[in-house]
Amino acid sequence: MAIKVLVVDDSSFFRRRVSEIVNQDPELEVIATASNGAEAVKMAAELNPQVITMDIEMPVMDGITAVREIMAKCPTPILMFSSLTHDGAKATLDALDAGALDFLPKRFEDIATNKDDAILLLQQRVKALGRRRIFRPVVRPTTPTPPPRSSASSVLGGVSTHTQPAPVRSSHAASIRPSGKQYKLLLIGTSTGGPVALQKILTQFPANYPHPILLIQHMPAAFTPAFANRLNGLCKIEVKEAANGDVLRPGCAYLAPGGMQMMVERTGVTGRVKVLAGSAEMNYKPCVDITFASASKAFGGDVLAVVLTGMGADGREGARMLKSAGATIWAQDEASCVVYGMPQAVASAGIATQSISLDNMAESILKESARG
């Protein structure tokens, strides 16, 4: 049975094109369209769609208000469309706070010109959210879409992909006994669902968290400054968008800039961030694999790396390199993920040693990071 989709936008052109693109996929079906947030709230309750695509700026009722009302009355996975501006980034983050699960940049030219990658991306995101199981009391079984092959392995130097899988323990924070390792760096990589997950985790960290933190979130260049500023205002630790040459400091989180690659190099007892344009052949900018791989070379086993919710398999090959160097790798568990793609890739390959719920992740990291 096709995933039922409600398309919400005040532009008749955009409603029509999004509907056409969604309906091109046999696994998807647009059941209705709405021209403002008020109509969306009404249709969501009446039609029970499995996914809603939502514009932000609309008459009568804006998209953020509509998200709040829908999540209060009939929780439904919502994909936001956002303009690539500072105000658009802020509004999108507000929508995610209100309960939306994911977003896509609103590029009229890509939609209008039938650009293949834009079409595929929209279809993939809608299907991923349509498989989100937490929202519905009755769930139809689905088969997860195999994560797309990353081009990172060639860039990272031909890492072997034949690690024998080992069982992954699903753990509660109380059940995790600190390993006693003395870490020098915390890495967190994520994609779909990441902004909310990162906020939940990092707001629980104390100001004196003992290690530098590198954050890799798939996000456009226009969004990462606003996201870093938001986290910095909410967290006790410092959060900043990473800049080339930043010296790593304990209790500071460095967010990889959108459209760039973030690497780390060792400089004496600490490290330094390198921000590069990177290869055009990479699927993701920023790419979790790139940051993880550089950390394996710079810090070896002195790293705790966590892979959170996200679509695809970015992070798997970099995590494999980290594990080979002696680092500790954790993954978010399936039940608490918006999309169980990136964590599944790490867990099913036998790279992650723990599978931890989002609710328990911060406490688990703090216990493991505590200096003896």
Swiss-Prot record:
Pfam family membership, one: Response_reg
Entry comment on modification after translation: Phosphorylated by CheA. Phosphorylation of the N-terminal regulatory domain activates the methylesterase activity.
Taxonomic source organism: Shewanella sp. (strain MR-4)
Domain of life: Bacteria
Chemical reaction(s) catalysed: [protein]-L-glutamate 5-O-methyl ester + H2O = L-glutamyl-[protein] + methanol + H(+); L-glutaminyl-[protein] + H2O = L-glutamyl-[protein] + NH4(+)
Gene Ontology CC terms: cytoplasm
Recorded domain comment: Contains a C-terminal catalytic domain, and an N-terminal region which modulates catalytic activity.
The protein, known as: Protein-glutamate methylesterase/protein-glutamine glutaminase 1
